[in-house]
């Protein structure tokens, strides 16, 4: 027995001697000095006291974990061996007798409850069947006497009929007894069933036995297949029931295809589509491979492709639009208030050579207040003019780009269209296009017959040509006013403005100035010093500096607003064009502008629109383009160039069809998938999108719906007015070559040092040639602060009052610009030439 002193024990347990002596006295030991000896029994007594003091239970462990490890060697080819180590772990838990008894009692209670429920259900089922038999027996007993009186053996059957009523009392025990008996002999019920279904003779001779066998299966099967079997499975499968009986009424695979409702948004991935159809993603990928399109499970599909896949696989498709955010935005923009009259918004349209720009310049010079040098800054595309009868807002939209964009988005930014027609030139294809734009938008027309001061002017011919296209003059009984004007002399301009204001009174244009501002973008640009600048036309409400605006997929707070004269303004009412600064990007022409209450909402909608546009653009990245078709012309298989062709007249369409179908050889061919007479419509654009075709327009133009699809889907659309150009371009496409590009080479740059007047040419710019050489009769651009404000032709070039064909760098010269008088000191005149350069793949 090991004996140690108190001091040594204190050192072992790392406790001060005084503290250890105190604990020993508390344990009932008689030690008082550090040199006294401590025996093992005294150590055990001290340990027991310390454990009881910390409330630690002194008991044996209830759970024991045993780990077993075995190592073996596995021989493989090449005289190599691999060592394999297998580890096993077993856990033994010791339960107290009380816990074991409680567990056993709980299982007994659960089993007894299940058996009672099964017995009660069997009794109810037997009682129900007995009642049904009792109701059916009187009918049989009434028909039996007529046929059974001569036969004495039938009497027991008639006596048994009334006795069927008290059967429910004894039906349940007999059913339980049969059930227990049949569980011990599982093969007998099948034999009895076969005998019961054996033949007609046995059923005729023993009808009472047949009725018993009809009632027997119900109580025998029902209790066992529901509660008792499920209870036996919960007990770990130790029940006496057969497992195969559980599958008697189990799941069976459907015999026919399951048709599901598939909701498809504007974009959907292959995995999401397969999940909605309850098929494996591999099936969808295999189907796409058969269609010739390899995809992955995470690839984004557009709405049309996903709809085709789901319908081909036999499912119902519901097309949904992810516009919940847009709908909530539209609800928040509704405003009710008092409406007042507003100024009309007028767009001037027509052929570029018919005097549209000259008419606008005259109206601007005549109606803008004096003191504003040069009138209105030319890069602003919208301005308003004050007249005696009210204000008129003009939209200067070259090429009608903003007008078609507005129509594509359903906006009614333009109220009246002034159609300019040259009296000496007549109706041109672009004039017809302008009429179609106005009719499609539901905008009234005012026809301005320009150049009436020329000798060849014929007003009746203009009326006759326009009446063919549905524009009838008021003099001829129609509703379209015709005004004869001369933009050069100023004749009839006041009458034209009078007619425009009269049309505005008929339209009864209204607006609510107290509402939040709402408008449309006329144009936008990126200014070097001010950032994104957008020219917007306020359509309704009032736009104020500091408002949070949402413009298409861009947003921002208005930091500054400028009117058409470049002066800062604090607010702008209906029909007033202004420039706004503060957006996070340059919006597209035609985008709608709305004033929102908070920045969070504006940012959320803008990001939603950007993501939506990005997804749709990625999904449609493989749309048919002419360049993509040209790049693949060198492949071995025969290629087909699909074309949708629209012409102005039937004769041109037939000639083009014959010429294009005759092109091609063994490797390439042309196929005209669609065509017709008239402008390019939305259905034509959809046909080109579905067939990966190119849109060709011969003397026709696309309407707003078609241009919207072309812009969104990235389709290739080309306009022609010479039949040989179409044939030549298609030949180049079929031979793997592209048409030529027009490249501009800058020849020289001159800076305006002084401006003086000439009675013959108007404003003459005294310039110093800074770079290159300035040539006469070459196209030029006028730049103000490095921004193009005019493009025209150099009409006069002189040096020391002598005409010069060219002036080199470092020399001074006088330059006269054709049809342009707004030259200022500091402007730069850029002379360039256009060179055709062949494109290469």
Swiss-Prot record:
Positions of the UniProt region annotated as Disordered: 87-254
Extract the ranges annotated as region (G3): 396-399
Q: What SUPFAM superfamilies does the entry give?
A: Initiation factor IF2/eIF5b, domain 3, P-loop containing nucleoside triphosphate hydrolases, Putative DNA-binding domain, Translation proteins
Q: Where is the composition biased (Basic and acidic residues)?
A: 96-135, 176-217, 225-234
- Region: G1, residue numbers: 350-357
Record-listed GTP binding positions: 350-357, 396-400, 450-453
Residues crossing the lipid bilayer are: none
In this chain, the stretch annotated as G4 covers 450-453
Q: Where is this region: G2?
A: 375-379
**Chain intervals with Low complexity compositional bias:** 136-175
A GO CC annotation recorded here is: cytosol
> What NCBIfam families has UniProt attached to this entry?
IF-2, small_GTP
HAMAP family, A to Z: IF_2_B (MF_00100_B)
- UniProt xrefs under PANTHER family: TR-TYPE G DOMAIN-CONTAINING PROTEIN, TRANSLATION INITIATION FACTOR IF-2-RELATED
Which family is this sequence assigned to? Belongs to the TRAFAC class translation factor GTPase superfamily. Classic translation factor GTPase family. IF-2 subfamily.
Q: What protein am I looking at?
A: Translation initiation factor IF-2
Give the source species. Answer: Pseudomonas syringae pv. syringae (strain B728a)
User: What's the source species' lineage?
Assistant: Bacteria, Pseudomonadati, Pseudomonadota, Gammaproteobacteria, Pseudomonadales
Whichever gene encodes this chain, its name is infB
